């Protein structure tokens, strides 16, 4: 039976709901997904899918929306795609089912989007490598991985994997080979399992044609990203070379600089054979005494901490927000307490509270893995300096008129304190 048949099964949806709500899932997301299940909103999407399977040249799945996300910390822009609300939710279930049914395809060095595996698990497993502190490392990112994967090269791999489920392959092929995307954003409604404003584009939305790879941002992209470089993962596994991949992030280790350079060349060659390239700005070859950075973590001997680049990124966000709130305060002749309270609310939410769609919070991502508070103290100190600036309007010694007790009264929560609370609870 095709996996597509499971998409109309209420029991499968209840299992999916239990899984989603077992994670860091905000109440409004739970409520929206619950309503979607109770109203059987997935049935109409299942009909759309069956229509595509029966006549893929005549029937088409609703188009994904194309969005451009600007990264405030750089001049880069990231292109992401989102299907309409109901369709996106059904594709999430399909992805959930595929990642579990086909997990045995993947070797142990792959950690992304897999059941019972995670970025944190990757870091902990790397720490178990024998004589890791004596090894050289080479880390690299695949350049624009999701949107650069050549669909014509992916399809044969996908067809081979799904040879016993031709209906599923027909449907996925129709999505991957659809040349059009929607541009209009104003008519997209809130998704039933997301607190962001994505989904449900109207029929009159403007469309364009473009090469979009596996469409970063869509649920199924995670399965495709794992599958496409499966043979590279397997090569390193078969040769018993210490290696890990999390989607487009790759790291490999060797006993000598010459050895690890050879592995790096092998990675670049395999990527080129797959129509991909490395991001030269993200290449790092490190000596044993330097430690290494992977997935936002810095590892050196037995120490696991937040990576310096991640600390810098958070400090930049805080500085921008503090300056923005200071302008807002001055323009509206508001008291410093109001601006400081807004700053605290923003970063409490960003660092400590659940985000949309069961994403891990910043703190949970790091707290479950790091074993030192050094970086947290740096971030705490910088955050407190921003709050002092907003309260006093100055960077001079007068800023110390604002006391730590004042911060707490406005709702401030220290990362170091939150970390120790987390570790005590986890014991």
Task: Indicate where each model-derived feature is located.
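Non-catalytic, polymerase-adjacent accessory regions of viral genome-replication enzymes
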Residues: 1-51, 394, 400-408, 418-427
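Conserved pre-motif C helix in the palm subdomain of viral-like polymerases
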Residues: 76-106, 208-237
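Glycine- and acidic
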Residues: 76-80, 107-109, 140, 210-218, ...
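Right-hand nucleic-acid polymerase module
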Residues: 88-92, 205, 234, 261, ...
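Active-site-proximal segment of RNA-dependent polymerases
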Residues: 95-150
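Conserved polymerase palm-domain catalytic core
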Residues: 132-247, 251-268, 286
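A common structural junction motif
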Residues: 268-276
């Amino acid at each position: 039976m095709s996996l597509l048949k499971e998409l109309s099964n209420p029991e499968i949806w209840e299992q999916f709901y239990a899984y989603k709500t077992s994670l860091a899932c905000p109440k409004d997301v739970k409520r929206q997904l619950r309503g979607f299940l109770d109203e059987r909103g997935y049935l109409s999407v299942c009909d759309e899918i069956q229509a595509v399977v029966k006549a893929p040249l005549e029937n088409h799945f609703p188009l994904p929306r194309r969005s451009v996300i600007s990264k405030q910390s750089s001049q880069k822009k990231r292109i992401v795609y989102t299907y309409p609300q109901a369709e996106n939710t059904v594709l999430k279930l399909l992805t959930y089912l595929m990642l579990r049914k086909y997990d045995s395809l993947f070797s142990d060095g792959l950690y992304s989007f897999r059941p019972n595996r995670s970025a944190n698990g990757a870091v902990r497993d790397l720490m178990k490598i024998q004589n890791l502190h004596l090894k050289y490392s080479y880390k690299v990112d695949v350049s624009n991985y999701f949107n650069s994967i050549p669909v014509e090269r992916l399809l044969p791999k996908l067809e081979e994997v799904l040879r016993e489920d031709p209906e599923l392959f027909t449907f996925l092929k129709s999505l991957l080979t659809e040349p059009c995307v929607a541009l209009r954003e104003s008519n997209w409604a809130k998704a039933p399992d997301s607190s962001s404003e994505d989904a449900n584009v109207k029929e009159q939305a403007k469309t364009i044609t473009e090469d979009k790879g596996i469409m970063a941002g869509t649920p199924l992209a995670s399965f495709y990203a794992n599958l496409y470089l499966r043979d590279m993962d397997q090569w390193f596994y078969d040769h018993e070379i210490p290696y890990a991949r999390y989607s487009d992030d790759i790291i490999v280790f060797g006993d000598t600089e010459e050895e690890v350079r050879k592995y790096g060349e092998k990675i670049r060659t395999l990527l080129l054979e797959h129509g991909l390239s490395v991001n030269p700005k993200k290449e790092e070859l490190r000596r044993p005494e330097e430690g290494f950075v992977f997935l936002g973590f810095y590892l050196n001997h037995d120490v696991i901490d937040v990576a310096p680049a991640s600390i810098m990124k958070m400090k930049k966000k805080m500085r921008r927000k503090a300056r923005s709130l200071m302008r807002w305060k001055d323009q509206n002749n508001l008291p410093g307490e109001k601006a400081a309270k807004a700053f605290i609310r923003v970063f409490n939410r960003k660092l400590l509270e659940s985000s949309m769609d069961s994403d891990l919070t910043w703190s949970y991502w790091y707290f479950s893995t790091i074993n030192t508070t050094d970086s947290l103290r740096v971030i705490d100190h910088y955050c407190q300096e921003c709050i002092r600036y907003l309260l006093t309007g100055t960077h001079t010694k007068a800023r110390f008129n604002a006391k730590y007790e004042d911060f707490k009264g406005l709702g401030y929560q220290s990362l170091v304190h939150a970390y120790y609370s987390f570790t005590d609870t986890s014991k």
